[in-house]
A protein has these predicted regions:
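Intrinsically disordered, low-complexity polar regions and short flexible loop motifs
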Residues: 1-229
Length: 229
C-alpha cells in the first residue's frame, strides 16, 4: 500500500490504517510502501485545518494498492486504486487523472492519443510497452492545447508504473510517477566483502584489488623465470 497526496492547498497529510500510521506526505509526494493484511481495512487521512477523511476498503490477498487523497468540489476524498502486476521483460504504464481543474483530457504517448476524454479520477488501462522512455502529453480535447507538454517517463523492464497527473487550485499541474509492482530479479543478488554489491554500476573494488594482485603475482613469476644475461 502506498499513499499519494493529491489534494492541492492542503499541508502535509498523514494516513493510518486501523489505527496504525502508514506515513505522511506533502502535496505531490508519495509515502510507503507498507504491508497490510487482507480483509476489511479502515483508513483515516488527517491534514492541517481539521481535515479528516475516512475510507473503508476490503483488501484482497496478494494485491497491491495506492491510496490517493483527491480534491472534490468542496472538500476532498480518498480513492483507492488497485495496482497491476509486473511482466518480466516488459514495462507497463497507466495514467490517473487527478487534476480537477483540467476537466476531461486527452492523453497521448509519443504523440499518439491513447485515451480520449479521460475524466477526473479516471484510471486508464495499463499499456504494455518496450522499456525505455515514453513521452506523455495531456491535451484539452476542445482546443487541442497541451495542458502538460511532453514529459519523459522512464520505464524499466519488469516494472508496472502509474503516472498521476496532479495539480489545480494554485498548484502547478505535474506528473507524479508511482511504482506499482516490480518482478523479482532473475539472477541471485551479488555478495562480497561487507555483503553489499555496487548499486550504481560502479566497480567492485574487492574484485579489482584481487585482479591487481593476481596480475602482479604473474609478472613477478615471469621475472623470476627470465634467464639472466
Amino acid at each position: 500500500m502506498r499513499f499519494l497526496h493529491a489534494v492541492p492547498g492542503v499541508g502535509v497529510a498523514t494516513v493510518s490504517a486501523d489505527g496504525q500510521t502508514l506515513g505522511s506526505a506533502g502535496f505531490g509526494q508519495v509515502a510507503g510502501p507498507a504491508t497490510l493484511p487482507s480483509g476489511t481495512t479502515h483508513f483515516v487521512l488527517k491534514a492541517p485545518g481539521g481535515v479528516t477523511l475516512k475510507k473503508t476498503v476490503r483488501l484482497a490477498d496478494g494485491d497491491s494498492y495506492t491510496l490517493a487523497g483527491l480534491a472534490t468540489a468542496n472538500a476532498a476524498t480518498i480513492h483507492v486504486y488497485r495496482n497491476g502486476a509486473a511482466d518480466p521483460g516488459k514495462a507497463r504504464l497507466r495514467v490517473v487523472h487527478a487534476a480537477p481543474e483540467l476537466g476531461d483530457a486527452n492523453l497521448a504517448l509519443d504523440g499518439k492519443v491513447v485515451a480520449h476524454r479521460a475524466a477526473y479520477e479516471d484510471a486508464t488501462d495499463y499499456w504494455t510497452l518496450p522499456p525505455g522512455r515514453e513521452q506523455l502529453e495531456v491535451r484539452d480535447p476542445g482546443s487541442k492545447k497541451m495542458a502538460i507538454g511532453m514529459r519523459a517517463l522512464p520505464l524499466s523492464a519488469g516494472t508496472t508504473t502509474t503516472a498521476y497527473v496532479v495539480g489545480s487550485k494554485g498548484e502547478r499541474v505535474r506528473v507524479v510517477l508511482v511504482d506499482d509492482a516490480t518482478t523479482a530479479p532473475s539472477a541471485a543478488p551479488q555478495t562480497g566483502l561487507g555483503g553489499l554489491a555496487p548499486r550504481d554500476g560502479g566497480p567492485n573494488w574487492a574484485l579489482a584489488a584481487a585482479a591487481a594482485l593476481a596480475i602482479g603475482g604473474a609478472i613477478a613469476l615471469l621475472r623470476r623465470r627470465r634467464p639472466s644475461r
